[in-house]
Amino acid sequence: MEKLEAIVDDIVFQSDDGMFSVLRMESKAQGRFTAVYHGNAPYMGENVAMEGSWIEHARFGRQFDIQSLQVLQPTSVAGIERFLASGAVKGVGPVTAARIVEAFGTDTLEILGTYPERLAQVRGISAKKAAAIGESYSQLSGLRELMVFLEAHGVSSGYAARLQATYGATAITRIKENPYSLAEDITGIGFKTADRIAMAMGMEHDCEARLRAGIAYALTQAAGVGHTCVPEELLVRETARALAVDSAMVQDVFSSLLEQDLLRTEEMGGICLIYPEYLYTAEVQTARRLLKLRDQAKPVTRVNADEVIAKWERDAGITLAEAQRQAIYASLEHGVFVLTGGPGTGKTTVVKGILNVLEQAGCRILLAAPTGRAARRLADSAGHPAATVHRLLEYQPTGDGLCFGKDDSDPLDAEAIIIDEASMLDISLTYHLLKAIPGGCRLIFVGDVDQLPSVGAGSVLKDMIRSGRMPVVRLENVFRQAEVSPIVRNAHKINRGQMPEFLAGADSEFALEEFANEQDAAEFVARTYAQLTSGGDWRRVQVLTPMHKNPCGVQNLNKLLQKYLNPPSANKPEVNIPGNVLRVGDKVMQIRNNYEKDVFNGDIGRVIKIDGKNVTVAFPERPEGDYVTYAQGEVEELQLAYAMSVHKSQGSEYPYVILLMVQSHYIMLQRNLLYTAVTRAKERVLIVGSKNAVRTAVENDKTKRRYSLLAERLQESSEVF
């Protein structure tokens, strides 16, 4: 690698997450040149020592790719003035910088760091302002020291600002004491990064701090794939493997954690299951509260349900199937009720019937769903306002996890609550929902248990049904009007383990296009998407895929689709986001709930304006002109949405779905994933890839059981329904 020393002449670009910078530099050896740096940019006027290599960018030409960077103290009067005038030190602009340097010359930085009170000698600087300038310079010096420390230990200096904000002046001391605390305290730093710092600092690979952090990491990873608990033997073995240490060492630390009540255990079938405290509490309390609610609510007797239902059928011009009628009555009889069924089986009709009776009885009713898109669909289909579960519970963002305004101390004002898309509920959110439900309120879960389970830990809907202790009605009859749909027919065939029937032609209602080469399949998808949306209706088509990586994964597809649909141009503004770039015209997805902006995880919109680092998005569900603007630091809430994972599509419907199914997705080729993807489409499904991949998914009904004891807890003390 080449070593260079240069002055920062200009900061051309800095990403919102502080992890990428484009700099204009000037040095005696190279003259003026462009450099790119994966980290926080130094300030204009600062002198830096760099190591890196020269690269040739296809669009921007020759650049110096900085691998490591150290800020040097400016030594010349001109360099010091330029640094201060850059805005690096709060309260100092070009005029004040010139006055300070005129007064102190090359001693300026020593004055700032050691004798800031002397700044009051400069015209226009009061004693109070001098103290503020000194404090700002001190923080900046601490930040620079922290950046150097991180770089020395192989960690991007882009984390420095977050570390300083969390730990203040003690950041380096805190990290040295226990680098593994970073994984708990700093968003974006996980166990692996903390472990890399610890190893670079010379910590022993079998020290107790590392083993404790490794166990916590293993439990976090397990929760990330849906488990609320893990068998002790598996937990110890996997932790030892990940840390490359002896299992006996992990077992010793694990036993210590149990003695300190930092983990919880449960015996089941001769197996010791280990829980993190928060998931143990959530699971135990969910079971207790479900059983209590089930038995508390009294049957609805304020109206004659038979008469209300009969009148509603006449007015609506429908005749309920017997299972639908039973479902309505069951919801009125029990405090907790579960309604499940596939597409076309009439779940929406049952919900409308339940609402009709409850409204006639004068009940206070609330409707909710796990995502914003699902809530809007519920509101449209039921003709009743609906919210996300988070909004219903008055979610309050905190750095410590889930926090809600509604709980058992201030419960919801409702006599009946209907939760749609209940298969998406994880155990933590269900627990917080149940905490906010008042005694005597009835709770109705509606969802398709055969779809993918929640992204978070637990299988709440499936476990409630599996327990046999909750009243359940499963709708299985597909109604005649739905039966004519190839999508509905094939969805049920897939769910029964049968291959779907593909119709001839890529423009048919249910088609397959086969490709031997995955990149060819991805290119075909991009061309087809471009043709289908050439009229400008970008909302009609959605590309779905099982995985994020490989040629047919979310990341590559989004880049490819963006290239076809929205390529760069000189007059088209753009802004960087992690792993990609956004341009005016791009289809984007909100990836976390933002209640201040009233946008939710999964909302799809279109970029209509980029002004500097501010991005404005139009979301079609909002009134015309009610746009959402994202400032610097908020843009990372967006990602390209031409393609998305099947998991991310849960709770949504699209007129046209293009689904990638290739053999390299084998680890994800499962029946419930294919079933979930197909049921996202209202009008047409085009599967691109291989028939063998489809067959693999159809035949693979061995969905890995999630470690969870919710069903068993519900069975412990209850009468069977």
Residues of each region from the PLM?
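Loop/turn positions that initiate beta-strands
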Residues: 45-47, 585, 602
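Conserved RecA-like ASCE P-loop NTPase motor core of nucleic-acid helicases/translocases
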Residues: 337-379, 446, 510-517, 531-550
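C-terminal accessory regions
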Residues: 496, 603-721
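Conserved helicase motor core of SF1/SF2 NTP-dependent helicases
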Residues: 353, 357, 361-363, 369-381, ...
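Conserved helicase motor core of P-loop NTPases
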Residues: 449-597, 608
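Pre-Walker A segment
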Residues: 267-342, 349
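Short, charged beta-turn/beta-strand-edge "cap" motif at the junction between a beta-strand
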Residues: 53-58, 591-597, 663-665
